Amino acid sequence: MQGSKGVENPAFVPSSPDTPRRASASPSQVEVSAVASRNQNGGSQPRESEDPQKSTEPSPPSSTLPASDEPPGSQLSELEEGPCGWRNFHPQCLQRCNNPKGFLLHYCLLALTQGIVVNGLVNISISTIEKRYEMKSSLTGLISSSYDISFCVLSLFVSFFGERGHKPRWLAFASFMIGLGALVFSLPHFFSGRYELGTIFEDTCLTRNSTRCASSTSLLSNYFYVFVLGQLLLGTGGTPLYTLGTAFIDDSVPTHKSSLYIGIGYSMSILGPAIGYVLGGQLLTMYIDVAMGQSSDLTEDDPRWLGAWWIGFLLAWLFAWSLIMPFSCFPKHLPGTAKIQAGKTSQTHQNNSTSFQHMDENFGKSIKDFPTAVKNLMRNTVFICLVLSTTSEALVTTGFATFLPKFIENQFGLTSSFAATLGGAVLIPGAALGQILGGVLVSKFKMKCKNTMKFALCTSGVALMLSFVFIYAKCENGPFAGVSESYNGTGEMGNLTAPCNANCNCLRSYYYPLCGSDGVQYFSPCFAGCLNSVSNRKPKAYYNCSCIERKVDITSTAXSPDFEARAGKCKTQCSNLPIFLGIFFITVIFTFMAGTPITVSILRCVNHRQRSLALGVQFMLLRLLGTIPGPIIFGVTIDSTCVLWDINECGTKGACWIYDNIRMAHMLVAISVTCKVITIFFNGLAIVLYKPPPPGTEVSFQSQNVVVSTITVEEDLNKIENEG
């Protein structure tokens, strides 16, 4: 072997028209490419060894190769494996993290932070933000959707250009944007001034004058744009995390371990909302203006109470920015990536439209290549089927994640806070467990692409059978005065106003349910005709109620007045809650067990160079067809079961107060089963259409085009033999 640069191979670094150069390659790298070339040439030459270490011709160690005459940093190969650090600073302590497990740890922390902010703190703070900044629900709904809008717009471009870039540095950028988004989201608190308490509202029958219709505007609602900006920044940070980060993990580990690592990473993004809800819930018990203190007579039960929603976003900002430095120190590829890729075999779906044979090694560097790359992906029928199956599943999962607490609250007569706690206790652990189990099973049995899709099909089938649990969870509505029950035989059905409360001028926009001693539920103390209350009792008690027929005294204390109603809903006679929660928990596990296998199948069925873009297309369509319309479809469906609407003094319809429980259960079953059937159909179609490549086909990782790499390596080998 002669020369000062060893074996030259332009396949490792795409040539540039301005500065054409050839990067050095070790003999082991040459042999890996040579083996791939023999496979691509139809096996005309016998294959010597799959392992570069077992070559019949001994290779000298890389340390014996002469040093390059090129300046430092100029001989970078496409596989830039190296130590952890920055430029020439590589502390030994950082090298312990320079492996897949070290990267996975930081990936999980960032995914956890993103989940805490986007799906935890934002959701639990929405109602507080509505009250503090006097916004309508339509505006806060747009705030929530801004994250998905940003993700959809950027996912394709980030995944396309980031595929050839330095993925860990992209994740450092993601950490910066997630932290910045959390910081911006908290800024309105610091610029809106001190929260001003209004007068307490007592909704008893005070024989007051009717409230006039008045509309007012507030400058506080202009902070809406700041919240939207924060969500857009969060979406910008989330895009590289779930596209480039997932592809980097898949690069760095063997095929059979990829599903395990991806499953663990995705499970952290699911546990994030749980932590966000717990953290946000605790912070909401603190008064909003922490530094100024609170009034001594103001408690959490007061309708005027607002919690310190903003503190959690500041904590997330600091934690996200603490991950910027760790991600920036990782090399472009972890040590050992080339050896791992050399041992992988291709599972790309084979047909005439997905060959992705581009003769230009610079393909993918220019925006002009973007339409061609997307068009190539869209022609991959297996990929499209898998994406459509995930969008259908995302529609139903996001719908249930949004409205499951409402379903539990109305079906079983629970408070909204307790219903939300039960919903989170079922959804989040079940989803995380399902993601991990799916990844573990695929990894343990070393499933190929087709078997992975079959596994996802089976888990979706089990989830379909369990979806009928909502039929058995249905509970009939209890008696409600003015809705399903008359006021002691007076008044009209469907009208909350009756002769017993006609002079009270009650507000229908103020829903404060109470249970009468007659077992009937009333809309509010005012509509029950109650004149007095005792607030030092838990729950609050009311008496002198003209609309309640006295039957049984709630209290047995002789010295106390005759209480006729207590605050809160009447207890339901439905006892199916434990069974429903148990079966639904199992349903969630099987639903999310298909998540990781489908992601792995998408990574396998597309060209190796298009994995990041494939994930970008998947997440874009998943949001456009799944997570964005999902809550809307569920919301419209649930609203169709409403029997009593909030109508204010201006005649404007607001939220729904009472639902038809039986109809709601049937409608949710219909949506769930329909989406599951669509998921199973496209999953099964992907299995039927999938055509694996010939056995032994290796993954082309080091160049855009295997043919170009093959010809170049053979020319270099011939040159060496002639010189030798």
UniProtKB/Swiss-Prot annotation:
What does the entry give for GO biological process?
cell differentiation; monoatomic ion transport; organic anion transport; sodium-independent organic anion transport; spermatogenesis
Q: Name one Pfam family in it.
A: OATP
The protein's UniProt keywords, in alphabetical order, are:
Cell membrane, Developmental protein, Differentiation, Disulfide bond, Ion transport, Membrane, Phosphoprotein, Spermatogenesis, Transmembrane, Transmembrane helix, Transport
Extracellular compartment segments = 123-141, 194-218, 291-306, 399-418, 471-580, 639-672
Q: Which residues form a coiled coil?
A: none
Give the molecular function GO annotations.
organic anion transmembrane transporter activity; sodium-independent organic anion transmembrane transporter activity
The induction annotation reads:
Expression is significantly decreased in renal failure.
Record-level GO cellular component terms = apical plasma membrane; basolateral plasma membrane
Q: Give the protein's function.
A: Mediates the transport of organic anions such as steroids (estrone 3-sulfate, chenodeoxycholate, glycocholate) and thyroid hormones (3,3',5-triiodo-L-thyronine (T3), L-thyroxine (T4)), in the kidney. Capable of transporting cAMP and pharmacological substances such as digoxin, ouabain and methotrexate. Transport is independent of sodium, chloride ion, and ATP. Transport activity is stimulated by an acidic extracellular environment due to increased substrate affinity to the transporter. The driving force for this transport activity is currently not known.
Q: NCBIfam families this protein is in?
A: oat
Record-stated family = Belongs to the organo anion transporter (TC 2.A.60) family.
Protein name in UniProt: Solute carrier organic anion transporter family member 4C1
Q: Which organism is it from?
A: Rattus norvegicus
Upper classification of the organism: Eukaryota, Metazoa, Chordata, Craniata, Vertebrata
